[in-house]
């Protein structure tokens, strides 16, 4: 623990969140594009917060999530420059942004 041990879980989490906020804010400020991946667990709240920060900093956002989260993330997707449902779509968007490549890329990823 960087800031020392805590017996109380609240203060343990508070200290960790404070350090993470510094790290995440710095990384987002230095990013050209933010790719935000949402899942089924509580961490999607952190992802939504990071997306909001990126939007406030006028950073382009690409979201990545399953179709079952479409409704829950409709406002986040509206704020994003692109909303993807697969890693392959994210790669295709980035390929187009970086070198103008429009042809579909094929990934050899173990599922």
For the regions a language model picked out, list residue spans one by one.
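Conserved catalytic or regulatory cores that recognize and/or transform ribose-phosphate-containing ligands
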Residues: 1-111
């Amino acid at each position: 623990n960087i800031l020392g041990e805590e017996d109380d879980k609240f203060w343990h989490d508070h200290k960790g969140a404070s350090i993470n906020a510094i790290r995440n804010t710095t990384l987002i400020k230095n990013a050209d594009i933010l790719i935000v991946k949402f899942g089924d667990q509580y961490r999607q709240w952190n992802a939504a917060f990071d997306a909001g920060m990126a939007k406030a900093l006028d950073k382009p956002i690409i979201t990545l999530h399953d179709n079952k989260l479409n409704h829950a993330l409709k406002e986040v997707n509206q704020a994003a420059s692109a909303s993807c449902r697969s890693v392959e779509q994210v790669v295709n968007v980035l390929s187009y942004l970086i070198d103008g490549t429009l042809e579909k890329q094929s990934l050899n990823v173990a599922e």
